[in-house]
């Protein structure tokens, strides 16, 4: 899939800095959970989920940042994409979010979390390009 087929939804400020104008980035200063909700809304509009919303080894409650790749164009509702994002939202609801505690005690960890999220997204973009 070329860049014209992908859109990144993120709350990570590093992502729009790292991607050029050929990439469509939907950046908002929102919570991790709100990113997933925004992705779910786009899936209901007919976009496809192109990266897993719970990718990586950092638990959702331990990082404030999330980037998810979806198709740029909408089609009909994809039940598999919807099932995956709804499962991710249910999983997140089980966690008590700890990331705000890091802000007070270790603000430098937020840069680390941004980099981890960016690396996961970069890998997803590269994998999608192989399709």
Predicted regions: what they are:
Residues 17-22:
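Short, aromatic/basic amphipathic alpha-helical patches
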Residues 1-5:
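Short, small-residue-biased leader/transition segments that mark boundaries at the very start
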Residues 23-63:
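Rossmann-like NAD(P)(H) cofactor-binding subdomain of soluble oxidoreductases
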Residues 61-74:
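Short basic, glycine-rich beta-strand/loop surfaces that mediate nucleic-acid
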Residues 34, 41-42, 71-131:
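Internal alpha-helical scaffold of NAD(P)-dependent oxidoreductase catalytic cores
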Residues 9-16:
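Short, polar loop motifs at secondary-structure junctions
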Residues 9, 26, 69-71:
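Residues in well-ordered beta-strands of folded domains
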Residues 6-8, 47-49, 67:
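Structural motif
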């Amino acid at each position: 899939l070329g860049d014209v087929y992908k859109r990144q939804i993120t709350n990570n400020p590093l992502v729009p800095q790292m991607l050029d104008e050929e990439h469509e980035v939907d950046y908002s200063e929102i919570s991790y959970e709100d990113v997933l909700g925004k992705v779910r809304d786009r899936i209901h509009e007919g976009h496809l989920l192109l990266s897993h919303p719970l990718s990586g080894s950092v638990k959702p409650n331990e990082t404030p940042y999330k980037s998810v790749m979806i198709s740029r164009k909408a089609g009909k509702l994809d039940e598999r994409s919807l099932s995956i994002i709804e499962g991710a939202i249910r999983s997140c609801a089980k966690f008590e979010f700890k990331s705000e505690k890091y802000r007070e005690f270790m603000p430098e960890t937020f840069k680390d979390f941004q980099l981890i999220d960016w690396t996961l997204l970069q890998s997803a973009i590269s994998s999608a390009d192989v399709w």
